[in-house]
Amino acid sequence: MKNDISISEVEKSTIRKLSFRILPFLILCYFIAYIDRVNIGFAALTMNQEIGLTATAFGFGATLFFIAYVIFEIPSNMAMEKLGARIWIARIMITWGIVGCCTAFITGPISYAISRFLLGAAEAGFFPGVLLYLTLWFPKRYMARIVAVFMVAIPLSNFIGSPLSALLLGLHGLLGLSGWQVLLILEALPAILLGVLCLVWLPNTANNVKWLNQEEKD
């Protein structure tokens, strides 16, 4: 009986530490991912007229994003299995951050369409990658609760993303850039930074984690 209580306490302590160390960072990553996915809608308020983008061309670009996302989902998951979830999550974030920054310099319908397709390809596999990473650390009986907490990033991004995007659009003229360009660059840069931090902050295995004691690692 004492052993059962002891094991239960160790498990609770381990889950608590993992939750505080891993979950907030992954929520932040997904928060940035969701903002980078939808911020083009805010940018369009001034971007479409500036680069001569029609509503049809804009909608076509949105379609290309999801087409690329679907096409590259399986290859991305296969690469993730070979390279590991942590490294692949970092790669995805750095790549989509770079594409997001480059989107600020599109000049017309063709470059816009290409940028949306590339962003979809870059982001493909992120959500499955995060889920796989979480399963490496949390027992199955905790996963429903953990994923529910992780998904808080979506309403959070909707709540913060709108006023943030409006604020950034107001920075028209900064460094000679249009407001929509400032918006896309400043909301894409965090993805690159977080991608690099993934390699440092997210542990690969329990063996090299200093913030778990030996009993918790076992």
Task: Give each language-model segment a name.
Residues I71-I110:
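Conserved MFS/SLC helix-loop-helix module at the cytosolic interface between two early adjacent transmembrane helices
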Residues S115-V152:
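Cytoplasmic helix-loop-helix junction between adjacent transmembrane helices
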Residues A144-L169, G173, P190-A191:
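Glycine-rich segments within core transmembrane alpha-helices of 12-TM secondary carriers
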Residues G52, G84, F105-S111, A122, ...:
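Helix-breaking motifs and short loop linkers at transmembrane-helix boundaries and internal kinks
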Residues R21-A55, I71, G161-S165:
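Extracytoplasmic
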Residues C198-L212:
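Helix-loop junctions on the cytosolic side of multi-pass membrane transporters
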Residues V38, F66-I74, A124, N158-F159:
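Residue-level signature of mid-helix packing/kink "hotspots" within the transmembrane helices
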Residues Q181-V200:
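Symmetry-related core transmembrane helices of the 12-TM Major Facilitator Superfamily/SLC fold
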